[in-house]
């Protein structure tokens, strides 16, 4: 049913799931078919992200169980200081390495509308993912771009920003005011 709906409405924004919806608690499933349906989903996700003024969006946020997200950092009213990057479709992502250097930053989430959270995350990560053609890519990401990747990766693990903000390490770092070495 979901595939049929996408074929009928390419590039049409999809409804965004909000905290409390079951899809946001589920672990995403590996993408195995790199076909037009996947490309259409990515296109619709991008349209949803742009319409909502986001810098990233994960498939579970548009009610799809697939391990897929899009990052497209650009300055906008939600993130006026965001660096500009070309949209990047990330399929079946893995975080291979996380730096010990942590940094805190304000994050919002399209699935937790109207709220911002201070979140500590590794400043640099090394990642591996597939593109829309199924080819494996490797990248080292830093700063805000690394933050977007980790935020969207959380969605694929069934973790929303609300849950991330309540994790013990986040509370400890907030109390201390700095990461523990």
Curated annotation (Swiss-Prot):
The keyword Iron is assigned to this record: yes
Co-factor note (free text): Binds 1 Fe(2+) ion.
Binding residue positions for Fe cation: 109, 151, 155
Pfam short name (any one): Pep_deformylase
Disulfide bonds: none
One GO term of the biological process aspect: translation
EC number: 3.5.1.88
Similarity comment: family membership: Belongs to the polypeptide deformylase family.
Name used for this protein in its record: Peptide deformylase 2
Species this protein is from: Shewanella oneidensis (strain ATCC 700550 / JCM 31522 / CIP 106686 / LMG 19005 / NCIMB 14063 / MR-1)
């Amino acid at each position: 049913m979901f595939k049929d709906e996408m074929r009928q409405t390419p590039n049409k924004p999809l409804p965004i799931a909000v905290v409390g919806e079951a899809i946001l608690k589920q672990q995403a499933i590996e993408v195995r078919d790199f076909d037009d349906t996947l490309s259409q989903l990515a296109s619709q996700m991008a349209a949803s992200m742009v319409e909502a003024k986001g810098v990233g969006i994960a498939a579970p946020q548009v009610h799809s169980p697939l391990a897929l997200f899009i990052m497209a950092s650009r300055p906008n009213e939600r993130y006026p200081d965001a660096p500009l990057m070309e949209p990047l479709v990330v399929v079946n992502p893995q975080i291979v390495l996380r730096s010990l250097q942590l940094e805190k930053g304000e994050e919002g989430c399209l699935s937790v509308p109207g709220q911002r959270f201070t979140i500590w995350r590794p400043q640099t990560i090394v990642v591996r993912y597939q593109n829309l053609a199924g080819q494996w890519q490797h990248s080292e990401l830093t700063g805000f771009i690394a933050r977007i990747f980790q935020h969207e990766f959380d969605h694929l693990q069934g973790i929303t920003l609300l849950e991330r903000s309540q994790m013990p390490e986040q509370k400890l770092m907030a109390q201390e005011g700095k990461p523990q070495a």
